[in-house]
Each structure stands twice: as C-alpha cells, then as structure tokens.
Amino acid sequence: MNVLILTGAGISAESGIPTFRDANGLWEGHAVEEVATPQGFARNPNLVHEFYNQRRRALLNPEIQPNAAHVALADFEREHLENGRGDFLLVTQNIDNLHQRAGSQNVLAMHGQLLQVRCVYSEEIFDWTGDLSVDTPHPEAPDDDSMRGCLRPNVVWFGEMPIGLTQIEKAATKADLFIAIGTSGVVYPAAGIVAQTPPHCRRIEVNLDDTPASSAFDETIRGAASVEIPKLLNHFSAM
C-alpha cells in the first residue's frame, strides 16, 4: 500500500503555531503582497525579515512541540516501511519542522522551511535559528561586505514554484491511500493533489470543517487532527 499524506496549517495550529492569516486575509495585519512575495521583499526587506524573524522566534519557543498527530504519523511511517508495506511520502505545506522533530523521515516541505535561509545569489541553503536583517553577513564569507544582506528565508512565497512538484505528482499517481490533514483546500497546487490520485486510491480528508476540496474525497472526518489521526492510523496499522 503506497501512502501519501498531505498536511496543512491545521495540524500545527494544535501545537500552538498560529495560522497567521486572519478572516480578512491579512498576515498579522499585513497584506500577503507585503510579506510573502518576491516583490514585497524587494520593496521592503526589513519588513519581510522582521515578519519571519517573529515567526522563527515563535517556532523556537520551547512550548511549541509536535502533537499527537505528528507523532502518530512518524510512528505509522516507521512501522509501514519496516514491514515493507509500500512507499510512504509526507508532503507538508507547513514551514515549521514539527514533522521532522516528531521523527518523520520522508518529509517533503513543499513551501520550504522556516529554520533555513537561502543565498539569493548562489541558491545555497543554510540551517538558521537566529534573526535575519539586511546587514546579516554571509555565513561562508562573513568579512565580505558585498555579501551582506544576501540571505532570505528559505520559504516559497506567492508567485514562486513550490518544491518537489514532480516527486509529489509521481507519489500521487501511484498512491493507494491519500490522507489530507488540516488543509484549506484552496491553495494550489497542493489542493489539486487529490485529483492526481488513481481511481482505486482511498482518499480521506481530516479537518475541522468542510473545504472546497471535500467533495473530491471518499471519506471526510471532522475533528481535531491530534484526536482523529492516531485513531485513523491505528486502523490502517491493524489491517
């Protein structure tokens, strides 16, 4: 049984990570165009850096920990692969590292990772836990003033290509089980993954509420991921 999992903001919200986008579509009072686009970064890098600095600090708060859903997914993956039951890929839209901290191995972070930065010139990626600013030196050339400010958050902004689309499509087309957890069903291309799964694939959506994509699933489970995912995965482990 080849398994494909897709997770969104809903699974991390239960760990205390806010979704940031409010009912008016604003991110902490800012329009998306200001803090989550290449154009916004070019116009006001200080604002964008501070926005992500705040998010990075919040993620590093010791109170932010993987919840029962993250742990259940990691345990299921380990058992699934150890017993040779098929392929497993966890695709997340989240930029936190809670899946990895829970022990998940085959994680594809399609929107990047908050605890990484990328050089705008070389595309090199570096692990990063501190703040960023327009004066931050390059980690490999700290004395080169021409390289100051060349780092940006390694996250996918609106208008940029998500990571790993070919790998995701390949996993979707051969999936026997597809579970979407805590996703809005409106952000593409993630929202279109369910349509790439084959006819025999069992498609399950786990969310607090209905989404625009709910009708594409064979089953919908309404409830908190930390409650529903352990129960659901226990069912498949026992099969």
UniProtKB/Swiss-Prot annotation:
Top-level enzyme category: transferase
Binding site for substrate: 52, 55
EC number: 2.3.1.286
Domain Deacetylase sirtuin-type: 1-239
Subcellular location per the Swiss-Prot or TrEMBL entry: Cytoplasm
UniProt record similarity statement: Belongs to the sirtuin family. Class III subfamily.
Record-given protein name: NAD-dependent protein deacylase
